[in-house]
Swiss-Prot record:
Pfam families: SelR. The keyword Oxidoreductase applies. Its EC number is 1.8.4.12. Residues 4-127 form the MsrB domain. It comes from Streptococcus pyogenes serotype M18 (strain MGAS8232). Belongs to the MsrB Met sulfoxide reductase family. The lineage of its organism: Bacteria, Bacillati, Bacillota, Bacilli, Lactobacillales. Keywords: Oxidoreductase. InterPro entries: Met_Sox_Rdtase_MsrB (IPR028427), Met_Sox_Rdtase_MsrB_dom (IPR002579), Mss4-like_sf (IPR011057). PANTHER family: METHIONINE SULFOXIDE REDUCTASE (PTHR10173), PEPTIDE METHIONINE SULFOXIDE REDUCTASE MSRA_MSRB (PTHR10173:SF59). One of its GO terms (molecular function) is peptide-methionine (R)-S-oxide reductase activity. This is Peptide methionine sulfoxide reductase MsrB.
Length: 145
């Protein structure tokens, strides 16, 4: 089992604070905010698959935005009343990493949700590297594209 110090060393200070203490990276600073390459996004802590580039859109909010996770079972939702707001926190199912929040102001044609996710909680696996990185089973997501 990885200790907190080992995890922090492996993923970095910002990713550690975001995933383990529900911190939020500053808007428009994350690596994946304005990034639209073909591939999947995984939990930086556990490597569990979370989102696809097929469901990513430019919301203008300053963080990566997705209309849905690859499968709903991959994330869990939790009420969040911090900072005097009522929001729904999104965590990864396996590791329980804080990812961000989900809002109901997403594209209507894609279900109406906007998963506003911290780049620091994610690792991007390019389509061309998915098989090599152990994510071959998810290649079929892109068969129609």
């Amino acid at each position: 089992m990885e200790t907190s110090d080992e995890l922090k060393q492996r993923i970095g200070d910002l990713s550690y604070e975001v995933t383990q203490h529900a911190a939020t990276e500053s808007p428009f600073t994350g690596e994946y905010d304005d990034f639209f390459e073909k591939g999947i996004y995984i939990d930086i802590v556990s490597g569990e698959v979370l989102f696809s580039s097929l469901d990513k859109f430019n919301s203008g909010c300053g963080w990566p935005a997705f209309s849905k996770p690859i499968e709903n079972r991959m994330v869990t939702n939790h009420d969040d009343s911090s900072y005097g707001m009522r929001r729904v926190e999104v965590k990864s199912r396996e590791a329980g990493s804080h990812l961000g929040h989900v809002f109901s102001d997403g594209p209507k044609e894609a279900g109406g949700l906007r998963y506003c996710i911290n780049s620091a909680a994610l690792k991007f696996i390019p389509y061309e590297q998915m098989e090599k990185e152990g994510y071959a089973q998810w290649l079929t997501l892109f068969d129609e594209t």
